[in-house]
């Protein structure tokens, strides 16, 4: 992965009553923000219970990859909340939704999907290439965010990197095939290639402690290195939709598709439940 000069992601204390406005501004400016100390150890323990269940077969969309030459494997699971009860508890009962919702400037908050990723010790080749999440989604609109909760201490050398401000134009780039970034992705929505990432660009990164949470817009370009550490590097992320998002029905992975929705529909239903909604004033 190319070495680039970096700046720190703007960070705020998740427990501060004044953090919402500042964090929302940082997210709007840079495309990513960090909320420190978002979750206590008791909530992380619930996620760990979910990991045990998911790896034991409760997740119907679990993949385990061990690349040639790596000592460790890379495991990931998508859309497991309906079959992994501890994940469901974390998503609906923890402070998660109430931390994320104010950042969207939206009258609603809808659960899109969850994503578990575990890079075991010395999964050196399990890097994540530069990409944007939105290019994989059958969605129109801009209020789509990923809330990414660190389960381990993540030092700078294994942390996510973000291209500051890359969300601002809502440009949709060509989706990247993670197994072979040079290959065409099967569900590509755009043929516009990713812009070159240069030394002059503002690359944002920060180390994380367990319970810290990154939040970024789905149009924000980001990447991550493999895990060269002697220990696990794991996170549990939950993706959310705001009130301007509609379904467009384009081909995508099953996790993102609901056959009960039609093009132009607001994305809500049993698969994508409404979690928060503003109460309209009387009269």
Where are these regions (language model features)?
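Short, charged/polar surface micro-motifs in flexible loops or helix N-caps
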Residues: 96, 106, 121-124, 153-156, ...
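Double-stranded beta-helix
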Residues: 156-221
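Non-heme Fe(II)-dependent double-stranded beta-helix
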Residues: 1-30, 36-130, 135-137, 251, ...
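Short, conserved beta-strand element in jelly-roll/cupin
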Residues: 138-155, 207, 215, 239-242
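Glycine-rich phosphate/pyrophosphate-binding beta-alpha loops
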Residues: 133-135, 144, 222-227
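Non-heme Fe(II)/2-oxoglutarate
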Residues: 1-13, 60-65, 69, 173-177, ...
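Active-site region of the double-stranded beta-helix
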Residues: 107, 134, 142, 150-160, ...
């Amino acid at each position: 992965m190319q070495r680039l000069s970096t700046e720190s992601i703007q960070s705020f204390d998740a427990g501060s009553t004044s953090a919402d406005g500042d964090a929302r501004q940082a997210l709007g400016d840079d495309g990513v923000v960090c909320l420190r100390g978002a979750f206590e150890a008791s909530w992380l323990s619930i996620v760990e219970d979910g990991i045990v269940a998911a790896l034991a077969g409760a997740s119907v969309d679990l993949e385990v990859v061990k690349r040639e030459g790596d000592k460790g494997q890379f495991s990931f699971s998508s859309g497991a909340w309906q079959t992994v009860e501890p994940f469901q508890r974390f998503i609906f009962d923890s402070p998660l939704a109430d931390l994320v919702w104010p950042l969207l400037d939206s009258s609603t908050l809808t659960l899109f999907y969850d994503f578990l990723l575990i890079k075991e010790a010395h999964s050196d080749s399990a890097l994540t290439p530069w990409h944007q999440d939105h290019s994989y989604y059958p969605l129109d609109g801009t209020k789509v965010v990923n809330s990414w909760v660190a389960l381990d201490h993540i030092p700078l050398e294994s942390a996510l990197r973000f291209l500051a401000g890359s969300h601002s134009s809502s440009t949709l780039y060509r989706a990247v095939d993670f197994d072979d970034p040079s290959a065409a992705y099967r569900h590509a929505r755009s043929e516009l290639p990713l812009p070159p990432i240069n030394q002059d660009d503002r690359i944002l990164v920060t180390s994380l402690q367990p319970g810290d949470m990154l939040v970024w817009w789905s149009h924000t370009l980001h990447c991550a290195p493999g895990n060269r550490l002697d220990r696990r590097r794991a996170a549990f992320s939950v993706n959310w939709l705001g009130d301007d998002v509609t379904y467009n029905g384009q081909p995508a992975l099953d996790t993102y598709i609901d056959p009960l929705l039609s093009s132009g529909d607001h994305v809500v239903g049993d698969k994508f439940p409404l979690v928060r909604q503003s109460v309209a004033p009387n009269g």
